[in-house]
Structures are given as C-alpha cells and as structure tokens.
Regions:
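Intrinsically disordered, low-complexity regulatory regions
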Residues: 1-89
C-alpha cells in the first residue's frame, strides 16, 4: 500500500492536472457555474470562489465515505482538495 500523502501529491500535481488542467482555473470556473445556478434556482445573492469549491468538493468526498466501505480513493481526493485549498487558493 502506498503512502497516502505521496499518492495525494502525485494525484494533484500530475494525474488530475494532466486531465483537468490547473486546479485554480478549474475551481474558479466551477464557482462561476455554481454561483449562476444557485442565484437562478434559489434567487439568492451569493458569490462562490475557488476556495468554496475546494471545501465543497472535500465535503462531497466526506459524504461518500459515510456510505461507502471502500473509500481510500475518497480519502485521497478529500485530502487533495484541502491541499489545493491550503497551498494554491
């Protein structure tokens, strides 16, 4: 079994970045879409940013861990989102 923190670092710096590009840009684009959706759907004034997205994506992974027995990948992803939050956003 590989070291989780090493796997997290590889995931956010290589694997996911190669697929999805720079997380700062990606999270800010997601924030724009989610902001538009929430404003339209619920008629609320809200402005999400990349930091909000990192937190909410981590919360999504935590929710999955509650209902799934095999959750190593969710742990890696949750730590990855929080690492991006702490280091890049």
């Amino acid at each position: 079994m590989s070291d989780i923190l090493t796997e997290v670092r590889k995931t956010i710096e290589k694997d996911r970045q190669d697929i999805y590009g720079n997380p700062e840009n990606s999270f800010n684009i997601i924030a724009q879409f989610w902001t538009t959706y929430l404003k339209s759907k619920y008629n609320i004034q809200i402005e999400l940013n990349g930091r909000d997205i990192a937190i909410m994506m981590s919360l999504l992974k935590h929710a999955r861990m509650v209902v799934q027995d095999n959750y190593r990948d969710n742990i890696i992803d949750a730590i990855g989102y929080l690492t991006i939050l702490g280091e890049r956003l």
